[in-house]
Amino acid sequence: MPEPAKSAPAPKKGSKKAVTKAQKKDGRKRKRSRKESYSVYVYKVLKQVHPDTGISSKAMGIMNSFVNDIFERIAGEASRLPHYNKRSTITSREIQTAVRLLLPGELAKHAVSEGTKAVTKYTSAK
């Protein structure tokens, strides 16, 4: 006599497991929204500086937050500078001035030299 087919046990009420596949009513998977971050670039720089060192996801989140913060500060300052001089264009000069105003001493000098190097590399590649 064949045994009745065993079905999977029903999940307990208040179970901690969540449904992993998000599906619409018609059965298709819902497309996940992409979250932009600088994690790929932070990781590349880390490997250039310390090839044998890793980074935790929490530390990567902090680095991503830091890069976003600095970007917003530089962009904000650079957008105010042309207004003072009655101009309507943000150039590399405004970015450079914003960096000089925001970053202290030696850090500003290094940032400006690295930025100049990056702009030169970009223009020569065109």
UniProtKB/Swiss-Prot annotation:
SUPFAM superfamilies named in the record: Histone-fold
Residues in cross-link Glycyl lysine isopeptide (Lys-Gly) (interchain with G-Cter in SUMO2): K6, K21
Modification type ADP-ribosylserine: residues: S7
Modified residues (N6-methyllysine): K47, K109
Positions bearing N6-succinyllysine: K35, K117, K121
Residue(s) carrying N6,N6,N6-trimethyllysine: K86
Modification N6-acetyllysine occurs at: K6, K12, K13, K16, K17, K21, K24, K86
Post-translational modification: Monoubiquitination at Lys-35 (H2BK34Ub) by the MSL1/MSL2 dimer is required for histone H3 'Lys-4' (H3K4me) and 'Lys-79' (H3K79me) methylation and transcription activation at specific gene loci, such as HOXA9 and MEIS1 loci. Similarly, monoubiquitination at Lys-121 (H2BK120Ub) by the RNF20/40 complex gives a specific tag for epigenetic transcriptional activation and is also prerequisite for histone H3 'Lys-4' and 'Lys-79' methylation. It also functions cooperatively with the FACT dimer to stimulate elongation by RNA polymerase II.
N6-lactoyllysine: modified positions: K6, K12, K16, K17, K21, K24, K44, K86, K109, K117, K121
GO BP field: antibacterial humoral response; antimicrobial humoral immune response mediated by antimicrobial peptide; defense response to Gram-positive bacterium; innate immune response in mucosa; substantia nigra development
Protein name: Histone H2B type F-S
Source organism: Homo sapiens
